[in-house]
């Protein structure tokens, strides 16, 4: 997998992407796709088309778009995914009324991202987890009954 880092001004095309940067503006990338999925825990529709997504880990509860499990990686139906390797907030504009592609930006003058390809969406995820690390199997107790205090406080109710 090739890692691309860009700083500077102007526009540079590579593969299906175009990079944009103007003095004083966030660095942006725009990629062609038909369906985008991912970006970690979100309380919005699974298919991200038409959404503006801000990834920043915060505990906002289930009634907001804020989450504390943001993952700056999305996958498309065109057999590629994009990982934005930035510790700060990342803003995604996903085929909304403002853009016809996926566009993402970060504050500052440096954008560090990786385009992860594969023969299928499954293969893209395999390549991504090779890069980021494979998840461990959770302990058996996590597959049992869970109680939540998000929606009820009466634990004497029958379940």
Regions found by a protein language model. Give the residues of each.
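Catalytic and substrate-binding clefts that recognize carbohydrates or anionic sugar/phosphate headgroups
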Residues: 1-140, 148-150
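Short, acidic/polar
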Residues: 153-159
């Amino acid at each position: 997998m090739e890692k691309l880092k860009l700083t500077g001004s102007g526009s540079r095309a590579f593969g299906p992407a175009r990079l944009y940067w103007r003095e004083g503006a966030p660095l942006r990338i725009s990629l062609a796709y038909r369906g985008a999925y991912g970006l970690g825990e979100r309380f919005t529709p699974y298919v991200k088309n038409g959404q503006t997504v801000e990834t920043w880990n915060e505990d906002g509860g289930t009634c907001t778009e804020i989450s504390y499990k943001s993952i700056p990686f999305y996958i498309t139906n065109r057999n590629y995914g994009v990982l934005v390797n930035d510790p700060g907030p990342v803003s995604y504009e996903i085929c909304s009324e403002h853009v016809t592609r996926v566009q993402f930006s970060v504050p500052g003058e440096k954008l560090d991202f990786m385009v992860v390809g594969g023969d299928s969406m499954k293969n893209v995820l395999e390549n991504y987890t090779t890069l980021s690390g494979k998840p461990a199997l959770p302990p058996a107790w996590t597959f049992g009954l869970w109680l939540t205090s998000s929606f009820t406080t009466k634990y004497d109710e029958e379940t």
